[in-house]
Amino acid sequence: MMKKFLIALVKAYQRWISPLFPLSCRFCPTCSVYMIQAIEKHGLKGVLMGIARILRCHPLSETGDDPVPDYFSLKRKKTPLDN
């Protein structure tokens, strides 16, 4: 129940707020998609993972693939393409 509510909040952001701003996410998947995937995979801990991801997404950060890891982590998972 809580997962569905949190995901609905992110989807509302995607639909009504995100279109008001230019594309700016430096990662794939986007931060909002990452948040949804993290919540689906890790429940409430996924919210913390999503917030950590948003804090990593700024002009001075690296770009590239940053998938949701299978384990709880607040750090970016490096992929072979990042090297």
From Swiss-Prot:
Q: What is its main location?
A: membrane
The protein's matches in SMART domains, at most eight in alphabetical order, are given as: Haemolytic (SM01234)
Q: Where in the cell is it found?
A: Cell membrane
From which source organism is this entry?
Answer: Streptococcus thermophilus (strain ATCC BAA-250 / LMG 18311)
Q: From the record, what ranges are coiled-coil?
A: none
State what protein this is by name.
Answer: Putative membrane protein insertion efficiency factor
According to its record, how does it sit in the membrane?
Peripheral membrane protein
For this record, an example GO cellular component is: plasma membrane
Q: Which family does it belong to?
A: Belongs to the UPF0161 family.
Keywords tagged on the record = Cell membrane, Membrane
Tell whether Iron-sulfur is among the UniProt keywords.
no
- Pfam families from the xrefs? YidD (PF01809)
HAMAP family reported for this sequence: UPF0161_YidD
Classification of source organism: Bacteria, Bacillati, Bacillota, Bacilli, Lactobacillales
Q: What does this protein do?
A: Could be involved in insertion of integral membrane proteins into the membrane.
